[in-house]
Amino acid sequence: MTPRLFALIPCAGTGSRSGSAVPKQYRTLAGRALLHYTLAAFDACSEFAQTLVVLAPDDSHFDARRFAGLRFAVRRCGGGSRQASVLKGLLELAEFGATDHDWVLVHDAARPGITPELIRTLVATLKDDPVGGIVALPVADTLKRVPAGGDAIARTESRDALWQAQTPQMFRIGMLREAILQAQREGHDLTDEASAIEWAGHTPRVVQGSLRNFKVTYPEDFALAEAILARPANAS
């Protein structure tokens, strides 16, 4: 049986670094909620069986009317960290008929520049892979190491062979669930899914990402994201 595709959007964070009273995934950019762009990209990929959005149990900002016409489901089961929210979302996917052998693509709600084309490139590249992988970009900037709490450069780090992880991150549902459970048992709270897969001894692949697919994190990122989203993805 051909493995099915599911998308999982952890959306339980508060976005404290964004400088906004409203969680960043609900901020309006180019006329729509930031989260809308992620949901629309996956909605355009009809090959997905379901897109599941994981909210915090006490989220009072989510308004389904802002996402009318898009195909997705919501579960208010988010945890205290990304890792916890993803794990709970993976368990909820079983309700939609997902099996351990099916694929899940986990994507940050705060990466509104994702496109259907990039999603499909990731799937096409990894659909026959035994592990899975992520979209990422080679590090372009010179890297400096600065001690915690300081402002003096300790040394310059080589950027050779370094990649900056993005999302979506695509893995088998069963493999990812067990990898996260193992990390939890060993006291680790990892910041992305590939880290859990690596921790379990597997080797994820990287697929070329896009500068457009950056993560909105700081206050100044909103203006850049709005400028990008106001233009078609294929605009020069």
From Swiss-Prot:
<dbReference type="Pfam" id="PF01128">
    <property type="entry name" value="IspD"/>
</dbReference>
<dbReference type="InterPro" id="IPR050088">
    <property type="entry name" value="IspD/TarI_cytidylyltransf_bact"/>
</dbReference>
<dbReference type="InterPro" id="IPR018294">
    <property type="entry name" value="ISPD_synthase_CS"/>
</dbReference>
<feature type="site" description="Transition state stabilizer">
    <location>
        <position position="24"/>
    </location>
</feature>
<feature type="site" description="Transition state stabilizer">
    <location>
        <position position="17"/>
    </location>
</feature>
<keyword id="KW-0414">Isoprene biosynthesis</keyword>
<keyword id="KW-0548">Nucleotidyltransferase</keyword>
<dbReference type="InterPro" id="IPR034683">
    <property type="entry name" value="IspD/TarI"/>
</dbReference>
<dbReference type="InterPro" id="IPR001228">
    <property type="entry name" value="IspD"/>
</dbReference>
<feature type="site" description="Positions MEP for the nucleophilic attack">
    <location>
        <position position="215"/>
    </location>
</feature>
<comment type="similarity">
    <text>Belongs to the IspD/TarI cytidylyltransferase family. IspD subfamily.</text>
</comment>
<comment type="pathway">
    <text>Isoprenoid biosynthesis; isopentenyl diphosphate biosynthesis via DXP pathway; isopentenyl diphosphate from 1-deoxy-D-xylulose 5-phosphate: step 2/6.</text>
</comment>
<dbReference type="GO" id="GO:0019288">
    <property type="term" value="P:isopentenyl diphosphate biosynthetic process, methylerythritol 4-phosphate pathway"/>
</dbReference>
<keyword id="KW-0808">Transferase</keyword>
<feature type="site" description="Positions MEP for the nucleophilic attack">
    <location>
        <position position="159"/>
    </location>
</feature>
<comment type="function">
    <text>Catalyzes the formation of 4-diphosphocytidyl-2-C-methyl-D-erythritol from CTP and 2-C-methyl-D-erythritol 4-phosphate (MEP).</text>
</comment>
<protein>
    <recommendedName>
        <fullName>2-C-methyl-D-erythritol 4-phosphate cytidylyltransferase</fullName>
        <ecNumber>2.7.7.60</ecNumber>
    </recommendedName>
</protein>
<dbReference type="GO" id="GO:0050518">
    <property type="term" value="F:2-C-methyl-D-erythritol 4-phosphate cytidylyltransferase activity"/>
</dbReference>
<dbReference type="InterPro" id="IPR029044">
    <property type="entry name" value="Nucleotide-diphossugar_trans"/>
</dbReference>
